[in-house]
Amino acid sequence: MKSKLKLHGFNNLTKTLSFNIYDICYAETPEDLQAYVQYIDEEYDAERLTQILTDVVDIIGANILNIARQDYDPQGASVTILISEQPVTPTDSQIEESPGPLPDTILAHLDKSHITVHTYPEIHPVDGIATFRVDIDVSTCGVISPLKALNYLIHQFDSDIVTVDYRVRGFTRDIEGRKHFIDHEINSIQNYLSDDTREAYQMTDVNVYQENLFHTKMLLKDFELENYLFGDATRTLSAEQREQVTERLKHEMLEIFYARNMPR
């Protein structure tokens, strides 16, 4: 086993794992599209997202400092959790009756170690396709690794397409004063995915090793139309319509996966 790096002082590396997770569906009528948005908005409201992120904090071995969450009108939700490596014992200033910290102070902590999630439901105005995007950032400063949350987060959502970015910034010093710009071995985010996840997704990497920047895109391999239909579409589509909807959905998924508009 490789020996641990002996550091001089605190580990100052910032490690950030960013997800964009997409769930795609088809609904035949405008009413069903709106019903899907309403359903997904209730399914992943701020309370549910808070529970998911709280589980992430436990998985990566961190401690919660503060939670802020909000549901939005007409749809969408956000949650931000400030975290630390060690449990925080309240100081006298925190217990006594006195003015709280200024917003700038709180934001300074937010830039160090935090977990955020935002949701974005969206509807295609013509094709009957709805997308639900979840944007998640797990950013830690110190020895805590956000990579531990990778598999859990992918499996918590109906993830048809996933884009993952991981970057390490800053540096830490060893006891001899030598700078270290990364403190662990990695050549791909895929190394940290479970076997079942790797088997379920088509994946491609774009990595810039010298910049400690890693990017993986994931597209679900198996396509079962029934998993993408919502409302009346589950009962009323003819065989020909099912073929057309399948083509539309696959086209939509490829455009999101490659991040570009593609000819039909």
Curated annotation (Swiss-Prot):
Keywords: Autocatalytic cleavage, Decarboxylase, Lyase, Polyamine biosynthesis, Pyruvate, S-adenosyl-L-methionine, Schiff base, Spermidine biosynthesis, Zymogen
PTM annotation (Pyruvic acid (Ser)): residues: 113
This enzyme's EC code(s): 4.1.1.50
GO cellular component terms given for this protein: cytosol
Record site feature (Cleavage (non-hydrolytic)), residues: 112-113
GO biological process, one term: spermidine biosynthetic process
Obligatory cofactor(s): pyruvate
Co-factor binding comment: Binds 1 pyruvoyl group covalently per subunit.
Keyword set includes Amino-acid biosynthesis: no
Catalytic activity reported: S-adenosyl-L-methionine + H(+) = S-adenosyl 3-(methylsulfanyl)propylamine + CO2
Enzyme class: lyase
Processing and modification events after translation: Is synthesized initially as an inactive proenzyme. Formation of the active enzyme involves a self-maturation process in which the active site pyruvoyl group is generated from an internal serine residue via an autocatalytic post-translational modification. Two non-identical subunits are generated from the proenzyme in this reaction, and the pyruvate is formed at the N-terminus of the alpha chain, which is derived from the carboxyl end of the proenzyme.
Pathway: Amine and polyamine biosynthesis; S-adenosylmethioninamine biosynthesis; S-adenosylmethioninamine from S-adenosyl-L-methionine: step 1/1
Gene3D superfamilies linked: S-adenosylmethionine decarboxylase
Active site: 113 (schiff-base intermediate with substrate), 118 (proton acceptor), 141 (proton donor)
GO molecular function: adenosylmethionine decarboxylase activity
Family that this chain belongs to: Belongs to the prokaryotic AdoMetDC family. Type 2 subfamily.
PANTHER family: S-ADENOSYLMETHIONINE DECARBOXYLASE PROENZYME
Subunit structure: Heterooctamer of four alpha and four beta chains arranged as a tetramer of alpha/beta heterodimers.
Name used for this protein in its record: S-adenosylmethionine decarboxylase proenzyme
Species of origin: Pseudomonas aeruginosa (strain ATCC 15692 / DSM 22644 / CIP 104116 / JCM 14847 / LMG 12228 / 1C / PRS 101 / PAO1)
Gene that produces this protein: speD
